Structure formats: C-alpha cells, structure tokens
C-alpha cells in the first residue's frame, strides 16, 4: 500500500460529494383527489438540473415500457406538460431519455425493475438532451403507474435544499473520517517499516571520549587566586571565562586547569586529550608540561648539544699537537690547586653554554693517551722536564661532571671540571680561564700525588 501517491483522492472526494448532493436534490410529489404522495428520487447526471420553482405535469406510461426503442405513442399537446414513466433495464439510461424526448415528453421518471431499495444516479451521454430525468424505486414506480393517464392527477418534481444540505454535511463528515483513517493507517504502516529496517541494520556506536569514572578520578581544586603564570591559570580555555573564587577546577596530567564541568564534558563527549597542548589526558605525568619556560623542543636540543660537545672535545684532544709551555716565574712547585668547592651551585648555565664549548653533564671517560701508567712511574722532576721541553705526552683518564665556576686569586672567573677518582692519590683536575688575551694554564703535580694542580700562565710571545 503506497500512501504517498494520493493526488487523485481530492478529485474523487469532490466527485462523490457532487453525486451524493444530487441524490437528495429532488422529490416527486403526486397530487390527486384528497391524496398527496411524496417519493424520494435521484436526479440524472446527464440531464439539466430542475429549476428552483420545480416543474409539473401529467404522468403517462409509455410503450414499450422500457423505452429502448422509439415510442409508439407521441405525447399529447396540452396545457399540462407530459411526463413519461419508464422502467429500468434493456438499454442505457440516455437512450431511454432520448427516445422519450423524441416522442415529445418534457420529463422522464425511471423506476427500478427490482425491489432493492437503493436509488442509483443515472449516468450517460448528455449530447442532445434537454429534458429532465429522475430515478425512483420500484414501489414508487408502481404507485405512479396506477395514476397514469389521469388528467386530474398532477405530478411535481421539486428540488429539496434541506435534504441536500444535510447530505453534504453527512458526506463531508464521512469523507473526513475516511481520510483520517487512511492517513493514520499510512502513518502506522510507515512507522512499522522504519522500526523493522532499524532492527535489520546493526547499530554501531563510535566512542569518542573517556569514561566518567576515569575523569572524576583526576585531581581537582577550588580556585582562590592565580598562583601560576600559564595560559590556563586565570581563565578556562574551553568556555573562555575567567575563574571565580570558589569554582571547582579540574587539573589534567599536563598541569593545565579548566572548569570541572567544561573539561568533563570535553573528555567524556568529544576527545581524550588536553584542549591546549593536545596531550593525552589518560596518560600519566612522566615529564613536566610544555609551557613558556619549558619549550617542547628543550629536551631534544639539550640532548643534541650534549652529544655534539662531547664528540668535539674528543676530536680536539686526539688531534691537536703538543705545544711548548713556559712556566711562569711566580708559580711554585709547591702551590696548591685553586679551591672551587665554595663556588655557588645555582650559577646560570646559559651564559656558560653560549661562551664556551658544551661538555656533557653525564660522566664520560676521555682518554688523552696512556698517561696514567707513565705518570705514576715517572718522578716529579722528569715530569716537569717533559713539560718544559714541550711534550705533553702523559695520558690522563678523566671523568667529568657538571661544570661549575670558581674565583681564582687573580680575580677572574674560572670554569672547572672536577674529577671523581677511585684512587687514594687524588684526582687530576683541569681548569680553564680567560684574562682578555690568549693564556693557557697548566695543572701539574703536587705533593698529594699524581695530580695537576698548579695553574701556570704562559707569557705571550
């Protein structure tokens, strides 16, 4: 049943109303001596409508009674219009009316040949027909037939407007009920089809967010005042509203803060990462969050700088040839290494990184040559002799730690690399400083053992 194709229903509805309105449009009234009879009739659809004042005449039964052939008797001319009484059957309604019209009758009354009690609306071709025609029941036709040919009997065909109005109202109400029933049927059928189709298609739900239990487990706080300097410390990045005193804030693993209601809706309904830094909110806090003070690429740059500085230092020590170094007259063999233990630890390392080669903060073994074995077996005088003659061939195994700053007796800052030694003889240390011109310092052995301690300044040539 296709309910969408109902374009012809309004036309059919109007046609039914017109036909049913004409069914109660007229009444046949018989007036005889002290007798008045009224019969219900239905007007034909192919003949002219009865005038408002109605028409009257005398009734005559024709021969043949079915009027399917030309009538044997013509209508008599007189002051009263002749009406032909015809029985149903044998031919079409328009043929009966046309034969009666040709015989001179002014109206045709057709009665049913069966006692069905149903009045029909006669249909046919209206070509060349200008007289009136109505349809009666079989009982009404038998009564009229008794008064056929009597000149003192008068028959009226009158329109009945009251019956027509009530019929239109009844038909309209019935038609509206039928239309409502059809529409309701279509609605329920369509609804049933949609439910059936939904049952056939597998339901696939796409999960976008986190579970509410996991979101509620994240830490939260009550806002009192701005305590940090970042993009989410004073306002919510989701609703763009400033925090108010007493509001509940949710803290994500990346340390960004939001309104609890805003970020809970974001994490459970949309995405599982931070709206600011795009970090997964379900992951743990293994590293500090990226902010203005800790850029995203800081760790990468730090690691690459360490590896570059270490490789550069190794290549420099291995390739550079020995240089002659003269001992400064003011330095003594009994001098001690400059103390660097009192240097502050919170020194700004950025200045050192930009002005001097970077040395890895991790412990590294730098092999300068096989220096330790010769250094331990060679006397102090031989060591100084080799240093004066320009041969720095004694190898040292040094472990470097984080560089720090000390102040020498000359007033200039020196950057030192301390050495962690496992032997009881001490540890060699290497120091470097700048006094405005090319200088180099030599750390050489003291009484404490095989360590380079005294810094010897080479005079410029």
Swiss-Prot record:
UniProt-listed InterPro entries: E3_ligase_sorting_rcpt, PA_dom_sf, PA_domain, Znf_RING, Znf_RING/FYVE/PHD, ZNRF4/RNF13/RNF167_PA
Residue ranges crossing the lipid bilayer per the database entry: 168-188
Signal peptide (UniProt feature, chain positions): 1-26
Keywords: Disulfide bond, Glycoprotein, Membrane, Metal-binding, Protein transport, Signal, Transmembrane, Transmembrane helix, Transport, Vacuole, Zinc, Zinc-finger
Lumenal side stretches: 27-167
Pfam families tied to this protein: PA, zf-RING_2
Residue intervals annotated with topology Cytoplasmic: 189-461
SMART domains, per database record: RING (SM00184)
Subcellular location: Prevacuolar compartment membrane; Protein storage vacuole membrane
CDD domains reported in the protein's UniProt record: PA_C_RZF_like
Official protein name in the record: Receptor homology region, transmembrane domain- and RING domain-containing protein 2
UniProt organism field: Oryza sativa subsp. japonica (Rice)
Gene coding for it: RMR1
